[in-house]
C-alpha cells in the first residue's frame, strides 16, 4: 500500500493482557489459532499519538491527507480522527463515508485515483461522501459463538441457533450492522447473499450494457482465515 501512496494505520487488539497489531506483532494465522482456542480478544482503536504521528510523517512529503477511517457506526476511531484533524488547518480531511473491510479498501483506491487525476483533498472528500450510501456488505457467519460474545445475540438465541444449525446473514448499509436473513445451511446463506447483491444492482443501477465498463458495479468477496 505504501508504494501506492496509501498509508495504513494498524488497529490494535488485546489478548491475554497483551496488545497486538495485525500482521505486525501477530500473523493472521496466529490470530485465528488463538481465537479458536477460546482466547478472550478485545478490539481497540489507534491512540491519538499513533494517528498524529502518522499524519505528521506523511505531511513531510505531501500537502494534504485524505484519511478514511472505519465506519463511525462500528468504531470510535472515526470521531477521534475528526477531532484530531481540527488542529491541522484543513490539511487533513477525514472521510466518514461509512466504509469497512473491502469497501474501505476500495475507497482508498478510489481516493488515490482521484488524487492522481488532480483532485484536491476537499474534492475527494466530497466525492466519497456523495457515494457513501452506494455500498452494501453481506456477511455470513458459520457460528453464533462470537455474536454471543459481542452481545449481538442472547445466549438463549445462540444456543437455539446452534442446535438448529442456523447461519445468520448480516448486512452493513451505511453505519448500521443489522440482521438480514437466516439460513439453515451455508449453501442457502450464500444463495441469499448472491440474490441480495443481484437485487441491489438491479434496483440501484438497472440494466448495464456489457460494454459500459465505466458504470459497472464493483463486487468483492472476502473470507476469514485467508481461505
Language-model features, listed with the residues they occupy:
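Glycine-rich phosphate- or other oxyanion-binding loops that anchor nucleotides, phosphorylated ligands
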Residues: 37-72, 79-80, 125
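Mixed-charge interfacial surface used for oligomerization/domain docking
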Residues: 1-18, 64, 73-93, 99-109, ...
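A short glycine/small-residue-enriched secondary-structure motif
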Residues: 27-31, 55, 60, 82-87
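N-terminal glycine-rich anion-binding loop in soluble enzyme alpha/beta folds
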Residues: 1-50
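Short alpha-helical interface patches
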Residues: 29-37, 53-55, 186-196
